Curated annotation (Swiss-Prot):
This is Putative ABC transporter ATP-binding protein CT0391. Probably part of an ABC transporter complex. Responsible for energy coupling to the transport system. It is found in: Cell inner membrane. The keyword Transit peptide does not apply. Keywords: ATP-binding, Cell inner membrane, Cell membrane, Membrane, Nucleotide-binding, Translocase, Transport. Pfam families: ABC_tran. The lineage of its organism: Bacteria, Pseudomonadati, Chlorobiota, Chlorobiia, Chlorobiales. ATP binds at residues 40-47. Belongs to the ABC transporter superfamily. It comes from the Bacteria. One of its GO terms (cellular component) is ATP-binding cassette (ABC) transporter complex.
Length: 289
């Protein structure tokens, strides 16, 4: 059976203070315990949707529901919401402002009124989890961009949320750093059953680390479904200003231009390798006949 929805929007419409329409009637469901990619070009509404999930962006109409309960935008309601739904911004400097790594990670916890031993346990566990324990006393402004990303993530994880929102988590990272942080996030989801929502325009990353996808354009949802359905909806992918994953595009060309008979949902190197090995085995079998 499909996982229950942990977050849901109904006809969500949000407008920025300058009058810019951010979200235009968005209906979307986020499955519990899965990784969902919000895919779209710049200005598609991905970041706005994350901000609405966290209560930062309040709708003009429609609503956001967490576990079937509409969000409460009172001070008390937002405080409770942000313990359950944590967000990591694209630019870590937007949420790092304490003098040291330890102090920055402790900031959110200090407002919860937790006993000091529990606060310390959470901070140390979060630092260990993201690999920044050795940086505990280091000034935040001395960190590399990748280290800042990890510290920002640790600050959110210390709150022990059930939903983790990530805005362009691989932006500004080298390929090795991007791969490492996405592998970490995937393992976090698998080991803890955490729900993760990733806003990105990196369509190569989505098939490797995500279960579901939401394709967005100009504040609207064009498609929502399993990640494997990207290729079936290639027209919507291109309408959104994106392209197919490189491997999927190659398969598309081989089938349409070169007469190959290949499965259409191949999107990763691993999947392509399996297909090619099968073709090779079939060729050998034909030669023996």
């Amino acid at each position: 059976m499909p996982s229950p929805d942990i977050l849901r929007t109904e006809a969500l419409r949000c407008v920025w203070p300058d009058g810019t329409l951010a979200l235009d009637g968005v209906d979307l469901s986020i499955r519990a315990g899965q990784v969902t990619a919000l895919l779209g070009s710049n200005g598609a509404g991905k970041s706005s949707l994350l901000l609405s999930f966290n209560g930062i962006l309040k709708p003009q109409s429609g609503r956001v529901l967490l576990l079937d309960e509409p969000l409460d935008y009172s001070a008390r309601g937002l405080k409770a919401l942000r313990q359950k739904v944590g967000i990591v911004f694209q630019n870590p400097d937007a949420q790092l402002f304490a003098s040291s790594v330890y102090e920055d990670i402790s900031f959110g916890l200090c407002n919860l009124g937790l006993p000091e031993p529990e606060t310390r346990r959470r901070i140390e566990a979060a630092m260990e989890l993201v690999g920044v324990s050795a940086l505990a006393r280091k000034p935040v402004h001395h960190l590399s961009f990748g280290q800042k990303k990890r510290v920002a993530l640790a600050g959110v994880l210390a709150m022990e949320p059930s939903v983790l929102l990530l805005d362009e988590p691989t932006a500004g990272l080298d390929p090795q750093g991007a791969d490492a942080i996405m592998r970490f996030i995937r393992e976090l989801q698998r080991s803890r059953g955490m729900t993760v929502v990733v806003a990105t325009h990196d369509i190569e990353m989505a098939p490797l680390f995500c279960d579901r996808v939401c394709i967005m354009e100009r504040g609207r949802v064009l498609f929502e479904g399993e990640i494997s359905a990207i290729v079936e909806h290639r027209d919507l992918v291109r309408q959104a200003g994106l392209r197919l994953p490189r491997i999927a595009h190659l398969i598309e060309i081989l089938v349409s231009k070169d007469g190959f008979t290949l499965p259409g949902n191949v999107m990763t190197i691993g999947a392509a390798r399996k297909v090619l090995k099968t073709l090779k085995e079939n060729q050998k079998s034909d030669e023996r006949r």
